UniProtKB/Swiss-Prot annotation:
Residue spans of biased composition, Polar residues class: 170-181, 285-295, 414-432
Basic and acidic residues composition bias: residue spans: 361-374
UniProt entry tagged with the keyword Magnesium: no
Function comment: May be involved in transcriptional regulation.
Gene Ontology cellular component annotations, sorted alphabetically: nucleus
Keyword Zinc among UniProt keywords: yes
One Gene Ontology term of the molecular function aspect: RNA polymerase II transcription regulatory region sequence-specific DNA binding
Name of this protein: Zinc finger and BTB domain-containing protein 5
Length: 670
């Protein structure tokens, strides 16, 4: 046997006791105001109060709780405590921000969602025709809360009191306007998040109930409309529908009332807005938009790896002709994120060199080169307008490549020789190579002797240098830009010098990709350090005669002028750096022993040899050089992870490593 009006009667009695100070066991102090209340009611409504009372259970000092008046104002708490006892919140433009802040502090999730929804929509509620119509609206809203608990509504007491005290005519306009006004709210909410399948099923049922609710509320049958909706709130339907009201509140005038029809136990999952009648069509259009955006992103991602002018014959395995064309800055093609080096292979195709498959999709671009490839304003004038034609064959004797050993000599003043090695076989197509003997760009097979057997793909050519193979890394590649390259090993051709110009086409990314391709293909076993391109707009040219450590008066001129073969005007270089005097050098002996550190004149006397960036202290310069070399001297003693900066190691040891260590502790210690 059920007593449907029992819960409403209990809360009415509790509210009466609170207002008259009867049987209250706690006092909430907000500023200079005191609010008497019951612990059980506060704990049932707010997890904040539940935590306070449960921790200090039995402590008599917790009878008086003081709240921060800067966070919770007295007016806002008065409205919230009225809502706890009556499920009615007086919300308007004047107090919505105070109520939102106080509800967030007290963990009243349903009130927070209601306030956010009110601030988002900024829709002023319609004014009720009379106070009695407003009171009748409040009673009907509270009846929904009781129906969700699986109880039938008491019709005798409510209908008799309403019919004896109030006419039902004023209710029609106010109630119909308040119900009709809720329809635009869910339309805006729909575009904020994608809802799950369960929510869609619930909202479809809510929309049907809303239609019946609007049709049932008429002037002739105001209280009877409540009974006609009883069938939607049977205990069976409650398993599917947990929020039959579309908004969980009734919007009134600026000082109107918001009625919370949710049971107090389910406040954590309460969602204020729901779906309107057009839910199916809106969800379908939303899903279509999401799918279209995903397809567009996928197409754009694939398109960014397409080559600009590919002329690669797939069937020509023994002899492939790759044409790399320099495009102006205002090129209409969308592939602006990848430099021209990556255009040697299409997005789905790959170029096989000595058994190492280097796919364009797997090439890792350094961030500096990819950002400067098309964003540099000088890139349109720095590019060489001619077409660089490469003759790429599987015959290793006919292929001139820039081996890593060219850039990793131990003596800085020596000449660097071009050699053949399987460690690095990607020729540099982005630099302007000027051959002294009027040779074509980047030696073709006719440039060298045709003698010698051709090695099969995947074979390893013996290193002509006397250095061990493990010295083929760690040295920065940019330090030898502009040094004369002498062709010595295996070739009897003429000598040629190369002046590298920073043409804005990702010069350094070509070397880093060449180093990356070999370890991924398994052709070489040296470690891989990712190189970061220097930030200087022009790659510097350093002559061996200028690096003499003995002559203190000799000046190291960082010549940044760009040379072109076809008579283009040279670009002005960066400010020239002058080598420090003998007095300064004598005071900076420690810096002279450091690799890649240069002592120059001026206040910032420590310069990076790779990119010519100057620093005030030697420590800062050494930290910067690690960006180029990829060194990580600082290791974590707990997990073994290495870092290039000591600050990174400190942050790791205080945060990430502690979490990793705590996750491995036995559960008994936690």
């Amino acid at each position: 046997m059920d007593f449907p009006g029992h819960f409403e009667q209990i809360f009415q009695q509790l509210n009466y006791q609170r207002l008259h100070g009867q049987l209250c066991d706690c006092v909430i102090v907000v500023g200079n105001r005191h609010f008497k209340a019951h612990r059980s009611v506060l704990a049932a409504c707010s997890t904040h109060f539940r935590a306070l009372f449960s921790v200090a259970e039995g402590d008599q000092t917790m009878n008086m709780i003081q709240l921060d008046s800067e966070v919770v104002t007295a007016e806002a708490f008065a409205a919230l405590i009225d809502m706890m006892y009556t499920s009615t919140l007086m919300l308007g433009e004047s107090n919505v921000m105070d109520v939102l802040l106080a509800a967030s502090h007290l963990h009243l999730n349903s009130v927070v969602k209601a306030c956010k929804h009110y601030l988002t929509t900024r829709t002023l509620p319609m004014s009720p025709s009379s106070e009695r119509a407003q009171e009748q609206s409040a009673r009907m809203q509270r009846s929904f809360m009781l129906q969700q608990l699986g109880l039938s509504i008491v019709s005798s007491a409510l209908s008799s009191s309403q019919s004896a005290e109030e006419p039902t005519a004023p209710m029609s306009s106010s109630m119909r306007s308040s119900l009709d006004q809720r329809t635009p709210f869910p339309m805006r909410r729909l575009h904020k998040r994608k809802q799950s399948v369960e929510e869609r099923a619930r909202q479809r049922l809510r929309s049907s109930m809303e239609e019946s609710a609007i049709s049932d509320v008429t002037p002739e049958s105001g209280p009877a409309g409540v009974h006609s909706r009883e069938e939607f709130f049977s205990p069976d339907s409650l398993k599917i529908v947990d929020n039959p009201k579309p908004d969980g509140m009734a919007d009134n005038q600026e000082d109107g009332a918001m009625m919370f029809d949710r049971p107090f136990g389910a406040q954590e999952d309460a969602q204020v807005p729901s779906q309107s009648d057009g839910s199916a069509g809106n969800m379908a259009s939303r899903a279509t938009q999401v799918e279209t955006s995903f397809e567009q992103e996928a197409v754009a991602e694939k398109g960014s790896f397409q080559c600009e002018n590919p002329e690669v014959g797939l069937g020509e395995k023994e002899h492939m002709r790759v044409v790399v064309k320099s495009e102006p800055l205002s090129s209409p093609e969308p592939q602006d994120e990848v430099s021209d080096v990556t255009s040697q292979a299409e997005g789905s195709e790959s170029v096989e060199v000595e058994g190492v498959v280097v796919s364009a999709e797997k090439i890792d671009l350094s961030p500096e080169s990819s950002d400067r490839s098309f964003s540099d304003p000088q890139s349109s004038t720095d590019r060489v307008g001619d077409i660089h034609i490469l003759e790429v064959t599987n015959n290793l004797e006919h292929k001139t490549s820039f081996s890593i050993s060219n850039f990793l000599n131990k003596s800085r003043g020596s000449n660097f020789s071009a050699s053949q090695s399987t460690d690095d076989n990607l020729p540099n197509t982005t630099s302007d190579c000027r051959l002294e003997g009027e040779a074509p760009y980047l030696l073709s097979p006719e440039a060298g002797p045709a003698g010698g057997p051709s090695s099969a793909p995947g074979s390893h050519v013996e290193n002509p240098f006397s250095e061990p193979a493990d010295s083929h890394f760690v040295r920065p590649m940019q330090e030898v830009m502009g040094l004369p390259c002498v062709q010595t090993s295996g070739y009897q051709g003429e000598q040629f010098g190369m002046d590298f110009s920073r043409s804005g086409l990702g010069l350094h990314s070509s070397f880093s990709r060449a180093m990356m391709g070999s370890p991924r293909g398994g052709a070489s076993n040296f470690p891989y350090y990712r190189r970061i391109a220097p930030k200087m707009p022009v790659v510097t040219s350093v002559r061996s005669s200028q690096i003499s450590e003995n002559s203190a008066s000799s000046q190291l001129m960082m010549n940044g002028a760009t040379s072109f073969e076809n008579g283009h005007t040279s670009q002005p270089g960066p400010p020239q750096l002058t080598r420090a005097s003998a007095d300064v050098l004598s005071k900076c002996k420690k810096a002279l022993s450091e690799h890649n550190v240069l002592v120059v004149e001026g206040a910032r006397k420590y310069a990076c040899k790779i990119c010519c960036k100057t620093f005030l202290t030697l420590t800062d310069c050494k930290k910067h050089i690690r960006v180029h070399t990829g060194e990580k001297p600082y290791a974590c003693l707990k997990c073994g992870k290495r870092f290039s900066q000591s600050s990174h190691l400190y942050k790791h040891s205080k945060t990430t490593c502690l979490r990793w260590q705590s996750s491995n502790l036995p559960s008994t210690l936690l």
